[in-house]
């Protein structure tokens, strides 16, 4: 007689084994109809599996986070059901849930097209309308092998090979189609309604390019039609803002096959990069950082000593010279310790903050590369703070202020903060972990910040705080971080002399605000849709001549503006002024200044903003004053 305890503390007693669906039915028919699965003693369980003992039960519906993930996973199986009905010689690989959706990797000699996506989607809709029950079969490993051998599902058989002999394997039966999964899944297809197949891409079995080439079908699914439509609108907007398209359209950068994952910056894009670097450099100087520059290629012996050679060797680019192996640095920290180690340091010298715009290289898989967002060569706004244990909290607190100041400058007000604490495998004493975690916690709490704890997610050498931005499309980008490190100063012999004249190892704080310049610029391109605020824009103002008579005045104004430090350009082509204004607008120039006979007479310009607002008549001093004010605000609205 299982006693079931519900979330409100109430108990229900059943005379025999009971399923989640039966528990829901005992509460009400409406709840039973909405039930997708359940959580039994904090473990997700299919709605139709019997519960035999006293348990705490939570009923899962589409309103729950777990419910929508189950819906998405069930849709992945529906892809399998549909393609197996439509195409021959299809072999199913894996079909997991991902953020906002799902995908299925499929092996087929036939190459799917966008037209096939429509065909598959139509078949899925047809299957859904039959409202069939999804049966769960819990079988032994031997029986699972037999099932998939009969169906010639070679990839499923490979997955089964890695499953232990003991225990049962969950098979899910969609009419004639059978798939394998940890589960749970929906009990009936009536729970599967609002979905869209999105795109096709290539992949490899288990992500290894030496394995079979697969075809991936992506989809999304939501509990409500409005949620689906809102998501599709966000995708459409994201495609419109895609930094790769805008980068090409506005001549910001390009990437080519001869140098995959490495950026060719064009003058417009490089201007943005330089302005961003200048801004961060100002911030660093204001906060007492010392800027350094370290070598690109370093003998592997340093990487062996730091531990990176053992852990990251496959991700490093290497070269050889005079019988020595060098690694092109994937990170800056070991080199920064070499700078710290030059000369004797006293506790009175700490904290020492060393910063570098460090160019790093990592041998990312070619399939993972994505425009500016995932590259092989990137520049970090990297810094390392060498301090005592007692100084951790103050340094972290100051850094948090710095992060919020910078992000606010770019219009990011919603910052997600996560604190990751000690993992099972770690270096350092429990005492120093206690001190460090307490310091990070206090630094956050003293600022009344909302943050999320991630127990056990810290690095083996220390706890960390991560800062993520939420952009205009509600996408989350992890950019900033501050990481406590007890290990590397010891490994690389970094020491200072304490108050008792004893040598001690400093604590090292790894920290970055932007993460990488490339990725952050990619985020900004999409956030602004290439409509950069005036301080960041490649060209801040363009001067347009109405007739040939006004060309000389345009050129003179332009020269004066450039000599005063503004990024100005001219359009003196023999075109109609309306056409020139449209061109300047399409080029996203923040300020458009028109000079005709009337303006020339009074030595002024007619000024308009990118959004079409008429700003009035400005002579050169007033124009400079206006631009200075806008540039000083750096896009801030307050």
Swiss-Prot record:
Residues 242-533 are annotated as: Catalytic. One of its GO terms (molecular function) is metal ion binding. Zn(2+) binds at residues 333, 384, 510. CDD domains: TGS_ThrRS (cd01667), ThrRS_core (cd00771). It comes from the Bacteria. Its main location: cytoplasm. The keyword RNA-binding applies. Keywords: Aminoacyl-tRNA synthetase, ATP-binding, Cytoplasm, Ligase, Metal-binding, Nucleotide-binding, Protein biosynthesis, RNA-binding, tRNA-binding, Zinc. It catalyses: tRNA(Thr) + L-threonine + ATP = L-threonyl-tRNA(Thr) + AMP + diphosphate + H(+). The keyword Chloroplast does not apply. Residues 1-61 form the TGS domain. It is an enzyme of class 6 (ligase). It holds the Pfam family HGTP_anticodon. Belongs to the class-II aminoacyl-tRNA synthetase family. PANTHER family: THREONINE--TRNA LIGASE, CHLOROPLASTIC_MITOCHONDRIAL 2 (PTHR11451:SF44), THREONINE-TRNA LIGASE (PTHR11451). Catalyzes the attachment of threonine to tRNA(Thr) in a two-step reaction: L-threonine is first activated by ATP to form Thr-AMP and then transferred to the acceptor end of tRNA(Thr). Also edits incorrectly charged L-seryl-tRNA(Thr). This is Threonine--tRNA ligase. It comes from Prochlorococcus marinus (strain MIT 9215). The lineage of its organism: Bacteria, Bacillati, Cyanobacteriota, Cyanophyceae, Synechococcales.
């Amino acid at each position: 007689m299982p006693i079931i305890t519900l979330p409100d503390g109430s108990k229900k007693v059943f005379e025999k084994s009971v399923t989640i669906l039966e528990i829901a039915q005992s509460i009400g028919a409406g709840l039973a109809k909405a039930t997708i699965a359940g959580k039994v003693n904090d473990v997700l369980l299919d709605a139709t599996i019997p519960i035999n003992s006293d348990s705490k039960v939570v009923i899962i519906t589409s309103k729950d986070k777990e419910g929508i993930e189950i819906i998405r996973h069930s849709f992945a199986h529906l892809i399998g059901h549909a393609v197996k009905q439509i195409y021959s010689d299809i072999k199913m690989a894996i079909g997991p849930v991902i953020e906002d959706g799902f995908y299925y990797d499929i092996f087929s000699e036939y190459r799917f097209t966008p037209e096939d996506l429509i065909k598959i989607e139509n078949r899925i809709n047809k299957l859904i309308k039959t409202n069939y029950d999804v049966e769960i079969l819990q079988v032994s490993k031997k029986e699972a092998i037999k099932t998939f051998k009969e169906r010639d599902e070679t990839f499923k058989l490979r997955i089964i090979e890695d499953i232990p002999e003991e225990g049962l394997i969950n098979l899910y039966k969609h009419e004639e189609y059978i798939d394998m999964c940890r589960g749970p899944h929906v009990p009936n297809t009536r729970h599967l309604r609002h979905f869209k197949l999105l795109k096709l891409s290539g992949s490899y079995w288990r992500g290894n390019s030496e394995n079979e080439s697969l075809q991936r079908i992506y989809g999304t699914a939501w509990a409500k039609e409005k949620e689906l439509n809102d998501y599709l609108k966000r995708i459409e907007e994201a495609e419109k803002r895609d930094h790769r398209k805008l980068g090409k359209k506005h001549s910001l950068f390009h990437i080519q096959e001869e140098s995959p994952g490495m950026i060719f910056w064009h003058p417009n894009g490089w201007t943005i990069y330089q302005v961003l670097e200048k801004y961060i450099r100002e911030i660093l100087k204001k906060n007492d950082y010392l800027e350094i520059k370290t070598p690109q290629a370093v003998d592997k012996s340093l990487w062996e000593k730091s531990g990176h050679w053992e852990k990251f060797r496959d991700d490093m680019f290497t070269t050889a010279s005079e019988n020595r192996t060098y690694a092109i640095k994937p990170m800056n920290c070991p080199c920064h310790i070499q700078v710290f180690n030059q000369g004797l340091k006293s506790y009175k010298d700490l904290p020492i903050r060393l910063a570098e715009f460090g160019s790093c290289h990592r041998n990312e898989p070619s399939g993972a590369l994505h425009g500016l967002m995932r590259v092989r060569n990137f520049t970090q706004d990297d810094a390392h703070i060498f301090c005592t244990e007692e100084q951790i909290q103050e340094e972290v607190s100051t850094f948090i202020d710095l992060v919020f100041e910078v992000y606010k400058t770019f219009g990011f007000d919603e910052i997600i903060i996560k604190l990751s604490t000690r993992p099972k495998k770690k270096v350092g004493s429990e005492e120093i972990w206690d001190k460090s975690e307490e310091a990070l916690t206090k630094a956050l709490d003293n600022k009344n910040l909302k943050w999320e704890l991630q127990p056990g997610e810290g690095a083996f050498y220390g706890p960390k705080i991560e800062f993520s931005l939420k952009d205009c499309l509600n996408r989350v980008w992890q950019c900033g971080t501050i990481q406590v490190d007890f290990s590397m100063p010891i490994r690389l012999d970094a020491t200072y002399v304490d108050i008792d004249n004893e040598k001690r190892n400093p604590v090292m704080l790894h920290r970055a605000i932007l993460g990488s310049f490339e990725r952050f610029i990619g985020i900004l391109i999409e956030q602004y849709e290439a409509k950069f605020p005036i301080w960041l824009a490649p060209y801040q103002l363009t001067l347009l001549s109405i007739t040939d008579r006004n060309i000389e005045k345009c050129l003179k104004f332009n020269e004066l503006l450039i000599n005063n430090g503004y990024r100005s350009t001219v359009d003196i082509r023999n075109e109609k002024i309306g056409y020139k204004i449209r061109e300047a607008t399409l080029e996203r120039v923040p300020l458009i200044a028109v000079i005709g006979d009337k303006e020339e007479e009074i030595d002024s310009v007619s000024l308009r903003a990118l959004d079409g607002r008429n700003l009035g008549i400005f002579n050169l001093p007033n124009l400079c004053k206006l631009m200075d004010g806008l540039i000083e605000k750096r896009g801030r609205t307050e």
